[in-house]
């Protein structure tokens, strides 16, 4: 079992505030289960000791209304979101925890746990990089669906693309 994580953030560094967390649990055939939560920006900054990047805020202002409006619904305190994600992930003990970039999703999420004196719910050696895989197999295109820059939609699309890479590129 593997998990693909996607974050929407207000920065690009390890101390970026997370404003949405999406995840897709998958095997070599399909996405089996999903997780999604929005996080209150004020809580992410105040409670999570995160730092907003003004350039990222300006970037978000240029994104589609559908992606931005989804972030305003059902926001939770950062610590609540982290506990809920831990409770969703921990029973599975995934083989790999994937993010779109070796220095983005997994690092930001792990660092958020640590800043709140919590242990990330996976071991660091399970970190995997989806961006590396898609770079190794550029001929295998993704069948993108859903709203771009929606953490759940992106996690599901990335997981499905990785499954396609495993099948077509690696013969798994």
Residues covered by each model-derived region:
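Acidic, Mg2+-coordinating catalytic module of metal-dependent nucleases/exonucleases
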Residues: 92, 96-103, 107-108, 140-172
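Hydrophobic positions within alpha-helical membrane elements
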Residues: 11-13, 110, 134, 159
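Substrate-recognition/cap helix-loop segment adjacent to the acidic, metal-dependent catalytic center
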Residues: 86-89, 103-124
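Non-transmembrane alpha-helical segments in soluble domains
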Residues: 68-69, 86, 110, 159, ...
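Short intrinsically disordered terminal tails
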Residues: 1, 52, 170-172
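Conserved non-catalytic scaffold segment of RNase H-like nuclease domains
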Residues: 3, 8-99, 145
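Short, function-defining helix-loop hinge/capping sites that tune catalysis or transport
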Residues: 14-16, 113, 162
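Short, flexible loop segments at boundaries between secondary-structure elements
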Residues: 121-141
């Amino acid at each position: 079992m593997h998990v693909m994580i996607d974050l929407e953030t207000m920065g690009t560094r390890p101390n970026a505030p997370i404003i949405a967390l999406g995840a897709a649990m998958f095997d070599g055939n399909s996405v089996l289960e999903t997780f999604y939560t929005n996080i209150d920006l004020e809580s992410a900054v105040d409670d999570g000791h995160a730092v907003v990047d003004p350039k990222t805020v300006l970037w978000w202002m240029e994104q589609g209304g559908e992606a931005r409006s989804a972030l305003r619904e059902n926001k939770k305190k950062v610590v609540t979101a982290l506990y809920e994600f831990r409770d969703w992930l921990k029973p599975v003990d995934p083989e790999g925890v994937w993010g779109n970039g070796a220095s983005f999703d997994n690092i930001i999420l792990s660092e958020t746990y640590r800043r709140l004196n919590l242990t990330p719910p996976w071991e660091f050696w399970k970190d995997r990089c989806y961006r590396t895989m898609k770079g190794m197999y550029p001929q295998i295109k993704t069948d993108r669906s859903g709203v771009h820059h929606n953490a759940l939609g992106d996690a599901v699309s990335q997981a499905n693309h990785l499954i396609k890479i495993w099948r077509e590129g690696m013969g798994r």
